[in-house]
Design a protein with these regions (language model features):
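Short, charge-rich amphipathic interface segments used for partner binding and complex assembly
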Residues: 25-64
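N-terminal acidic leader/helix
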Residues: 1-31, 60-69
Length: 69
């Protein structure tokens, strides 16, 4: 599973149709979804957790390679 997540994050990091600020906004949205579930004592939505992970890795890859998309 980890290799698939890394591959998806790498693809997103190199996608010039998605801006870095859009990725950051999506990370913030996923954080809200996760925190809301935690505050309600509900299970954390797996899709939100997985998506946040992919987005976070993609943004870090961009920052580390100085891609300013």
């Amino acid at each position: 599973m980890r290799n698939k997540l890394a591959a998806m994050a790498n693809t997103l990091a190199q996608d010039d149709t998605v801006a870095s600020d859009e990725i950051a906004a999506a990370i913030d949205y996923m954080e809200i979804k996760i925190r809301t579930a935690e505050a309600r004592n509900e299970p954390v939505p797996f899709v939100a957790f997985r998506t946040r992970t992919i987005l976070t890795i993609a943004l870090k890859l961009r920052q580390e390679s100085d891609l300013s998309l």
